[in-house]
Amino acid sequence: MSLVSESHAEELVRGAGQLGIPLDDRQQRLLLAYLALLIKWNKAYNLTAVRDPDEMVSRHLLDSLSVVPFVAERGRNWLDVGSGGGMPGVPLAIMFPERAFTLLDSNGKKTRFLTQVKLELKLANLEVVHARVEQFQPSTAFDGITSRAFSSLEDFASWTRHLGNAETRWLAMKGVQPDDELQRLPEDFRLDACHVLKVPGCQGQRHLLILRRTS
């Protein structure tokens, strides 16, 4: 029996349309193939607390796709920190095959899963790194750095400071707007923008906070 049903495909296409993000055949096929791998591996690897496959389209795929317009603005070299099961990094790599995405996680089980995703989906623009973020030392700064349910804004900024520069945008996906966390931002970071995300099928508040370095 297929792990991904026709209703999952319909929900994905419908939800992406509501987000204003039409999917071509390749994008739809790869997103559903990724969903099937996530469902399969989650049983043994505990990649996500969402156990019900019927919830994964909205809570993982559509939630990840909600930041596509902001990634589309600019930046060819992206880092997804604490990528876990690959959200939002894998869906973004599928949507932007001409851009490079590095998925970073310190959990070996999760990076093994992400490596399998890269191989099976043939995502040449995806790199998987098994390391702690503080110890990751790439040769060049990233244009954009994403996180989803990773840490506080203070830690996100502090731990990834060395991975960006004054041109880098830090995109933090959050639930309710974290006003208390914003008060504790490092002095060399500022809030550039805050966007309310409307994710089809997701209850509760969703926000995207875009941070920039001030120096």
Curated annotation (Swiss-Prot):
It is found in: Cytoplasm. InterPro entries: rRNA_ssu_MeTfrase_G, SAM-dependent_MTases_sf. S-adenosyl-L-methionine binds at residues 82, 87, 133-134, 148. The keyword rRNA processing applies. One of its GO terms (molecular function) is rRNA (guanine-N7-)-methyltransferase activity. Keywords: Cytoplasm, Methyltransferase, rRNA processing, S-adenosyl-L-methionine, Transferase. It is an enzyme of class 2 (transferase). This is Ribosomal RNA small subunit methyltransferase G. The lineage of its organism: Bacteria, Pseudomonadati, Pseudomonadota, Gammaproteobacteria, Pseudomonadales.
